[in-house]
Amino acid sequence: MSVDLATVKRVARLARIAVSEDEANRMVGELNGILGFVEQLSEVNVDGVEAMTSVTPTAMKKRTDEVTDGSKAADIVANAPVTDHNFFLVPKVVE
């Protein structure tokens, strides 16, 4: 795949970026260079290579799944104008 001047201008217009003619011509070469590097990466054989999520091998620590109220209900409703038993009270809007 290659990028031409019309594509650069179209993308710049869609991104609402002001690009001069000289800048657009320079970007054509830069974008084609980037796409060349991406094409090289797609040629690498990665069969049997496990996907990496980190540079160092790590295992996520698991915690027990416990349901709690968070012990913060009073703090959460502290600034509410009207509450009842740690619930927000709001005016009725639907009859």
Swiss-Prot record:
It catalyses: L-glutamyl-tRNA(Gln) + L-glutamine + ATP + H2O = L-glutaminyl-tRNA(Gln) + L-glutamate + ADP + phosphate + H(+); L-aspartyl-tRNA(Asn) + L-glutamine + ATP + H2O = L-asparaginyl-tRNA(Asn) + L-glutamate + ADP + phosphate + 2 H(+). The keyword Ligase applies. Keywords: ATP-binding, Ligase, Nucleotide-binding, Protein biosynthesis. One of its GO terms (molecular function) is glutaminyl-tRNA synthase (glutamine-hydrolyzing) activity. Pfam families: GatC. It is an enzyme of class 6 (ligase). One of its GO terms (biological process) is regulation of translational fidelity. Its EC number is 6.3.5.-. Allows the formation of correctly charged Asn-tRNA(Asn) or Gln-tRNA(Gln) through the transamidation of misacylated Asp-tRNA(Asn) or Glu-tRNA(Gln) in organisms which lack either or both of asparaginyl-tRNA or glutaminyl-tRNA synthetases. The reaction takes place in the presence of glutamine and ATP through an activated phospho-Asp-tRNA(Asn) or phospho-Glu-tRNA(Gln). PANTHER family: GLUTAMYL-TRNA(GLN) AMIDOTRANSFERASE SUBUNIT C, MITOCHONDRIAL. Heterotrimer of A, B and C subunits. This is Aspartyl/glutamyl-tRNA(Asn/Gln) amidotransferase subunit C. It comes from Rhizobium johnstonii (strain DSM 114642 / LMG 32736 / 3841).
